[in-house]
Swiss-Prot record:
Domain of life: Bacteria
Parts forming coiled coils: none
Family: Belongs to the NAD(P)-dependent epimerase/dehydratase family.
InterPro entries listed in its UniProt record: Epimerase_deHydtase, Lipid_A_modif_metabolic_enz, NAD(P)-bd_dom_sf
CC terms in the record's Gene Ontology section: cytosol; extracellular region; plasma membrane
Protein known as: Uncharacterized protein Rv0501
Length: 376
């Protein structure tokens, strides 16, 4: 595993960070979720920080509350103007917004999800704008803002955009939220705004759509396609958020592990059985859902499982000064081992079968060549 880099220069989204200072009072939203809760615990253990305030609309579990240590928990919905009072009275100088959810509540669907994410962010950033003590805002965003398509570049840079505009859903909400926090940086140029676009996260403790998708004995795949996966270990996601909160580097940063893993390789490493399904529009999406007995997959996730997504992380290393400890392959292997998943079939045997199949196909092809004019 690689070790952490040195420090880098400042980015360019709102605020100046030529002489960054350590935060004294940090507020973390989404404190009852994995990232928010464990980030709160990390920051509370840092003696350079005087006070950590954890905020969520629901009460944390006893275990999470214990992990938070000296952090103060405030039960508050960030959609409520009360959040402004919490920031003002607490003299908060650094806000880490980690509360955005990628899945809808049990009732309400996408409309409820948009209400939670977008309206909450608007209220929170408005409160930050009015609070003279706030000097730093860190937003946990997502690589999903780039989308996935057959026309994607080899790697997305922070200046790239999706090849297909989003009309709704979590990627659209995430882009809107990024726009609101950039507007905050323009209105308050003394606030350093940091946006972290996290790659798809995976690990032994974090529960995500991708981790559940790969945990089943039968893993549906899109026939004829093999997605390129760039992952991010859950601990590296926490490390990046902590680094951003402490460093105060303004800018937008892609956060992802080194290397890629093809979906077919991931399935083999896990000893799972791939189940190809047809790739014809909505029917393919429905087939994927039925084959996996799983209804959470939406259009964007379907595209990701078809084409994948890879980001350029140069700015993360050079400017933010952060280097993930786990590579993509190491992150996947740690997830698989940590979950205690038992291979359905021996991965070595799968590779042996695959090698034989490729050999047979090559021999058959040499005896039965297909003229190029016949391909369309």
């Amino acid at each position: 595993m690689s070790s952490s880099n040195g420090r880098g220069g400042a980015g360019g989204v709102g605020g100046s960070s030529e002489h960054p200072q350590y935060p004294k009072v940090v507020l973390v939203t989404g404190a009852c979720r994995f990232l928010g809760g464990y980030l709160t615990a990390r920051l509370a253990q840092n003696p350079l920080i005087n006070r950590v305030i954890a905020v969520d609309a629901i009460a944390p579990s006893k275990d999470m509350l214990r992990r938070m240590g000296r952090a103060e928990f405030v039960r508050a919905d960030i959609r409520n103007p009360f959040i402004a009072k919490v920031i003002r009275n607490g003299e908060v100088d650094t806000v880490v917004h980690a509360a955005a959810a990628s899945y809808a509540p049990r009732s309400g669907g996408s409309a409820a999800l948009k209400e939670l994410n977008v309206m909450g962010a608007m209220q929170l950033f408005a409160a930050c704008q009015k609070a003279p003590s706030v000097r730093r805002v860190v937003l946990k965003s997502t690589s999903e803002v780039y989308g996935s398509s057959p026309h994607d570049p080899v790697m997305f840079t922070e200046d790239s955009s999706s090849r297909r505009p989003f009309s709704q859903g979590f990627p659209k909400d995430s882009l809107d939220i990024e726009g609101y926090v950039r507007a905050l940086g323009r209105r308050r140029p003394d606030i350093a705004v940091t946006i972290l676009r996290l790659a798809n996260m995976i690990g032994p403790a974090m529960d995500t759509t991708l981790s559940r998708y790969l945990a089943g004995p039968l893993v549906p795949t899109i026939f004829g396609r093999d997605a390129r996966l760039q992952l991010l270990h859950e601990q590296d996601a926490l490390g990046a958020l902590e680094r951003a909160a402490m460093a105060g580097k303004a800018g937008t940063f892609n956060i992802g592990a080194d290397g890629i893993l093809m979906l077919s390789q991931a399935i083999r490493r896990a000893g799972r059985i791939p189940v190809p399904v047809p790739g014809f529009g909505v029917w393919a999406l429905d087939s994927l859902r039925r084959a996996n007995h799983y209804t959470e997959l939406n259009r964007e996730q379907f595209a990701y499982l078809s084409y994948g997504r890879v980001m350029d992380t140069t700015r993360m290393r050079v400017e933010l000064g952060y280097q993930p400890k786990w590579t993509t392959v190491e992150a996947f292997d740690d997830y698989f081992r940590g979950r205690g998943l038992t291979p359905i079939i021996d991965p070595h045997r799968v590779r042996s079968w695959e090698g034989r199949a490729v050999g047979l196909a090559q021999r058959w092809g040499s005896r039965n060549p297909i003229p190029w004019s016949g391909l369309r």
